[in-house]
UniProtKB/Swiss-Prot annotation:
Hemolymph. It comes from Biomphalaria glabrata (Bloodfluke planorb). It is found in: Secreted. GO terms for molecular function: carbohydrate binding. This is Hemolymph 65 kDa lectin BG01. Keywords: Lectin, Secreted. Transmembrane segments: none annotated. GO terms for cellular component: extracellular region. InterPro entries: Fibrinogen-like_C (IPR036056).
Length: 25
């Protein structure tokens, strides 16, 4: 699941990182 925020950042729901959210610029 990838969510694009209003600021243009992308949050990726990944199970490889403790099931947390990783933020990409």
């Amino acid at each position: 699941v990838v969510v694009t925020l209003a600021s243009g950042l992308e949050m990726c729901d990944t199970t490889t990182d403790g099931g947390g959210w990783t933020i990409f610029q």
